[in-house]
Curated annotation (Swiss-Prot):
Record-annotated membrane-spanning stretches: none
Annotated SUPFAM superfamilies: P-loop containing nucleoside triphosphate hydrolases
Name of the protein this chain belongs to: Small GTPase-like protein LIP2
Organism classification: Eukaryota, Viridiplantae, Streptophyta, Embryophyta, Tracheophyta
Domain of life: Eukaryota
Gene3D superfamilies reported for this sequence: P-loop containing nucleotide triphosphate hydrolases
Disulfide partners: none
Gene: LIP2
Biased composition (Polar residues): 242-253
Natural source organism: Arabidopsis thaliana (Mouse-ear cress)
Listed InterPro entries: P-loop_NTPase, Sigma_54_int_dom_ATP-bd_1, Small_GTPase
Length: 333
């Protein structure tokens, strides 16, 4: 019997897989620029002929492995190579979802801005998208300084429909946001000089990344490096440059997405009176306990004449029957 218990314990230990991490990346831009085609190309590795219109938001998941150096992390420990899931949140750019898009702007690790190379207005509107995400979004491991519109997380600008723009004679569209993205990424030092984007000579230096999702043409290596950088920022903060470096970043403590406590619970936990006495001063609300029934329910106060002194019914009847005259015999009227 003891042998089978030890054998079962060993099998359970071997079956336990290392924890998988996850990062969340928003994909935003005007309606019709090809965000859904981009997400499908990144996740599936192939183009989609007729993508359907996005209703609210759709999520695509990309699996990646990240090989950590010998330095250990405060969040993930163990083997040097781990599995990670990149959540690509494709947010609809239609105006009908403008009032509810902020529901999807939570726990953001990075942003992908997409514009149409054949329509210059879609690139000009990226500044509006950056401001919308910055104002209404909630970010994980924000940067010390913000990008365009105050965006506090890393981002990349991608120009789609390069095939259509080439046929129409449209050059790589110019815009202030892409130039600001290039200067901001270089200033923050998010990537070493050897890894700066774009990685191909066919990409002009002031346009960002160019792709043609319909023809399944995009820089897979560049996007993979972006995702690895976001993973490193959230889970392996000790790999980032030291504060003494010119390209250093100051990081806020990252929060796991699988934590079950709400913001209200965290507030009560921080405001406990003593840390040592967890039983007496634990102010976390007990959500799993039912409220005890009241033995003597209190009657609600009367809204009318609650300040007037109350009389017994018998005295009122005697007064009404005697026409207001007292029945005491010792009083001479």
């Amino acid at each position: 019997m003891r042998f089978w218990r030890e054998r079962g314990r060993e099998n359970k230990e071997h079956m336990v897989a290392p924890l998988c991490g996850q990062i969340r990346v928003l994909v935003v831009g005007d309606s019709g620029v090809g965000k859904s085609s981009l997400v499908h190309l990144i996740v599936k590795g192939s183009s989609i002929v007729r993508p359907s219109q996005t209703i609210g938001c759709t999520v695509g998941v990309k699996h990646l492995t990240y090989a950590s150096p010998a330095s250990s992390s405060s969040i993930i420990k163990g083997d040097s190579e781990r599995d990670f899931f990149v959540e690509l949140w494709d947010v609809s750019g239609h105006e009908r979802y403008k009032d509810c898009r902020s529901l999807f702007y939570s726990q953001i690790n990075g942003v992908i801005f997409v514009h149409d190379l054949s329509q210059r207005t879609t690139k000009t509107n990226l500044q509006k998208w950056a401001g919308e995400v910055s104002v209404t979004g909630e970010f994980s491991a924000p940067l010390s300084s913000g990008g365009p519109g105050g965006l506090p997380v890393p981002y990349i600008v991608i120009g789609n429909k390069a095939d259509i723009a080439a046929k129409g004679g449209t050059n790589g569209s110019s815009g202030n946001l892409v130039d600001a993205a290039r200067h901001w990424v270089e200033k923050q030092g998010l990537l070493p000089h050897s890894d700066e984007l774009p990685l191909s000579e066919s990409f002009p230096s002031n346009v960002g990344l160019i792709m043609a999702a319909k023809e399944a043409r995009y820089d897979k290596e560049a996007l993979t490096k972006i995702f690895h950088m976001l993973i490193r920022r959230r889970y392996f903060s000790d790999e980032l440059p030291s504060p003494s470096s010119a390209w250093s970043l100051s990081h806020a403590p990252s929060q796991r997405l699988d934590e079950g406590t709400s913001d209200e619970d965290q507030f009560y936990k921080r405001t406990s009176l003593r840390e040592g006495d967890a039983y007496k001063y634990n102010t976390l609300p007990q959500h799993n306990l039912m409220q005890s029934p009241t033995l003597y329910p209190q009657q609600p106060p009367d809204r009318y004449n609650y300040a007037i002194p109350r009389f017994s019914l018998s005295s009122v009847e005697e007064t009404s029957n005697g026409n207001g005259r007292s029945k005491r015999m010792d009083i001479n009227v």
